[in-house]
Amino acid sequence: LLLEARERTGGRILSPSVTEHEDSKIDMGPTWLWPQLQPRMTQLIQKLELPIFKQFTQGNMLYENPQGQIQCHGGPSSHGQSYRFAGGSIALINALKNQFNTSAIQLNTKVTDINTESLTISAEQNGKAKHYSADKIIIALPLRLLANNINFIPELPSELIASWNNTSTWMASHCKLVFIYDTAFWREQNFSGEVFSQRGPMTEIYDASPHNQAFYALTSFIGLNAHQRKQLGKKDLLRACEAQLVHLCGTQA
């Protein structure tokens, strides 16, 4: 049984479609995997028969210093051993979801209470109270959200709750911005699409084109936290990112 508070499965994995083709998706959440470093993930992928492909790293990479000066480097990429899912990371979620009976996945079901002695769960589903019992309970939730959104019975030690609240969530402050193109002009210029910037607002950029090359894309990480992004505003942030990409890659961007 899977209880999911949202209206969809996948959590922080989100791969919206750009075209109608099944493989034409962009990863707005987690993107890469490393078979050499993740043997259990590799075994799972093989078991589920999911196709993966190597991150595009051919060509030069760019470095932008704090003053906006650009340097071109031809050394090996830090993503030389990185792979991506054909069809986006959501392909893994969909394959796992297919292992469940449809009735075993309860969407829009927010867990409110967990009794760790009786292994019973209270939840709210579309405004209605729900109750479940289990032999084992596995919680897939960032620790800060867990500490502030679920009531445990009996009450957990205050030291444990404090440690949860003091545990940062990996990549929680990051924001992605994706640029989509009909042609991969950077590849034609012997540029891998890889950029590292100390100026920003985008601090890292990578080639995010899908395996089927139905379109081409550059994905970026914005080096501003949520408060800074809110202060700047969406329109000005997008304008600054577009200007930076033109500065880095030329008017084709």
Each language-model region and where it sits:
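FAD-dinucleotide binding site
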Residues: 1-253
